[in-house]
Amino acid sequence: MTHKLTPMMQQWHQCKEQAGDCLLLFRLGEFYEAFFDDALILAQNLDITLTQRQNVPMSGIPATCLDGYVDRLVSRGFKVAIAEQADNTEGSKGLVPRTINRLITPGALLSSSLLPEKANNYVLAINQVGSLYGLSCLDLSIGTFLVAEYDNTKDLIEAICRLAPTELLSHAKFYQKNEAVIKQLQQHLRITLSEYVSWAFEYQSATKKLYTCFQVSSLDGFGLQGLVPAINAAGALLSYIQDKLLLPISHLSIPKIYGQQKHLLIDKASQTNLELLSPIHGEHGKGSLLQVMERTSTPMGGRLLRNTLINPFYDLKEITLRQDSVEFFLQQADLRKILKRQLSCVRDLERLATKISTSLATPKDIGTLRDSLLSCTHIADNLQNCALPEFLENKFLIAPPLCSLIKTLSTELIQELPLKVSEGNIFANHYHPDLLRLRNIKENSKSWILEYQERIRNETGIKKLKVCYAQALGYYIEVASNLAPQLPKEFIRRQSRLHAERFTTQELQQFQDEVFSVEDKLQTLETKLFKELCFYIVEHRDLILKLSTAVADLDYVVSLAELAAEYDYRRPLVDHSDALSITKGMHPVALTLLDKGTFIPNDTVMHSAQTRMILLTGPNMAGKSTYIRQIALLVIMAQMGSFIPARSAHIGIVDKIFTRIGAGDNLSKGMSTFMVEMAETANILHNATDRSLVILDEIGRGTSTYDGLAIAQAVVEFLLFTDGKKAKTLFATHYKELTELEMHCQHVENFHAMVKENSGQPIFMYEIVKGHSKKSFGIHVAKLAGFPLSVVSRAQQILHQFEGPDLRPEPEKAQQLVMF
């Protein structure tokens, strides 16, 4: 059917075939047009008009608004291909050539308003060889390049969920073979699936791509020897970025093995249950631990805080180094204030370095880099005479080559830089000998025009004669139509207007040629100088990134000190013991949401040789869930190197945190609440260790009472008596039968949420005390929830019958015919 299409539509079809599953935006003059199904998608998602020509649906967007519209499409998960008109087509005849020069996908963003300021934006490739899975992920905006390998899908899925990529890349066979894996990932992540050619995932192709990218002949120096699935994924990802998306890869860091440094492991379910990054309900981010802890001043510090929150340290040295730094800045309030102000002037050094390395930087970006580097020198000056803790020692000794770069940027650039190179006025006059000369000629042209205008007014006697400039005409002389006959013959008519005539002269034309030539020369010179400056900056990229890491580390510990000062956090003792002792501990999020002084603190004492499991009973709304979550959050904060909301704490390092909390169950996954509960509990039983912390909130609710009780007790016994699984466990339950375990096992201790009664009405004290709860007060909670009073009254009657000698309540007479 192609022969029936116009030449332009044939060209569109060729581009569309190249674009694949991308939405194609096709440049036509001052618009980008979409056709057929793409036009429908464009119109529906951008709220623009859908039209048609010769029965072909079409819609379009102005070229000047391209970036904003593309961002909106990508934010909704679409991949977009841009087909541009070829350059230098003036005077050419026939159809203008068009080629795809950009493909934009959610995970492959170099520079975009969609990039989260304080989070990574990963595209992740995945590959399988036999029973092994290899993954590789890139954050193109900062050059981070990671690889990893797993021998089971559970660890694979957990790793991908922690990285939280926005785009997943593989080949058709992998997607077909691993539908269950992809389905699980889509349940946890908002992710765009991309497909690439299978041969790119083969070892020979992948290694060749890696060799070329990093200019090496072996990958052993990267520590990748033997990691065939990971190497395959890494090579395919580089090929996809460079060959398919047409993006640069020269700025990427060498691949690092993800997860090589051991961390406190927090699985995706626990991240969600503990509301680490976002709340289960409510506004995005608000009410999360991240939102409470976020006091960073730089994008790099913010990304470091976020990544450390979901990957706290397991190495005691790493924890102690950061604690020492937090303590140092906590005691230095004036210095902390100065540093916070200076850190707030440092922009995203990592992403600025990437933009410059990939030739995407504007003069304004260079100015931002200059100002940020200058702020770093001010930070270094303020730290110079301080007895810094070990964590920050020598991190702000700025290398001489970087000092030279900072000096160049500070002295050789104009203070207010333009957005585009073509606007000029980037460099100081003394930066290049031709700059001042050309600028003087350009500047003197203004006075020449005024002098010329005055001279020909005197020569012609026409006092209202004007010398003007228009983009289309250039310089011209304008007089009223009735005065035009008075002009000498050497005046050449250019244009007639309603009441005016426009002329030029040989002298004016010669002047214009000289001025235009100067402007062209000036723009060419500044463009050349700008490119040279960018190359000079790229030579210092490693030093800039090293300084960026130092800024992130400083921002991290200063922000934690600021948090500790604001809420009177205390330094926990963290060591290799198996202690978990917290005095007057408080939930860090709830503490910020309540009026000052109203949150009730509670103690916790657990030790493997003594209490290894706390069975917590008490009515709903009495604070049980808040308390057990609180313990997990305080452990996480402590292993981040942070101070915590407690009077004191002694925390033995934890290797894993597991939670089973029903509030976040997602029934859209196709599993019942009970099945979700059992699956999460099974994960805990299989993977907990003696150094783990387990939080269980109501096990066995979704089945019969005796089934549920049996499951709950079996879980308790497993965690108490199975070698290698004796994790510290906080178990909130309504099964009062479980509390009898305290009499038979020395490692179990009963606690309950205290409730006082006043005229039969419960008063929740929010205190956790020894012993088990006597009443559940469930009917009272139902009343508070708005149950009809008749239902509340009937429930009370049934409860009394249950508590009496006859444990089977009789139905009300009015209901007997209905029930039987």
Curated annotation (Swiss-Prot):
Induction: In infected human monocytes transcripts are present by day 1 post-infection and last for the 7 days of the experiment. In patients with confirmed synovial Chlamydia infections, 5/8 had transcripts. In infected human Hep-2 cells, transcripts are visible from 11-48 hours post-infection. One of its GO terms (cellular component) is cytosol. InterPro entries: DNA_mismatch_repair_MutS, DNA_mismatch_repair_MutS-lik_N, DNA_mismatch_repair_MutS/MSH, DNA_mismatch_repair_MutS_C, DNA_mismatch_repair_MutS_clamp, DNA_mismatch_repair_MutS_core, DNA_mismatch_repair_MutS_N, DNA_mismatch_repair_MutS_sf. One of its GO terms (molecular function) is ATP-dependent DNA damage sensor activity. ATP binds at residues 618-625. One of its GO terms (biological process) is mismatch repair. PROSITE patterns: DNA_MISMATCH_REPAIR_2 (PS00486). Belongs to the DNA mismatch repair MutS family. HAMAP family: MutS. This protein is involved in the repair of mismatches in DNA. It is possible that it carries out the mismatch recognition step. This protein has a weak ATPase activity. This is DNA mismatch repair protein MutS. It comes from Chlamydia trachomatis serovar D (strain ATCC VR-885 / DSM 19411 / UW-3/Cx). The gene is mutS.
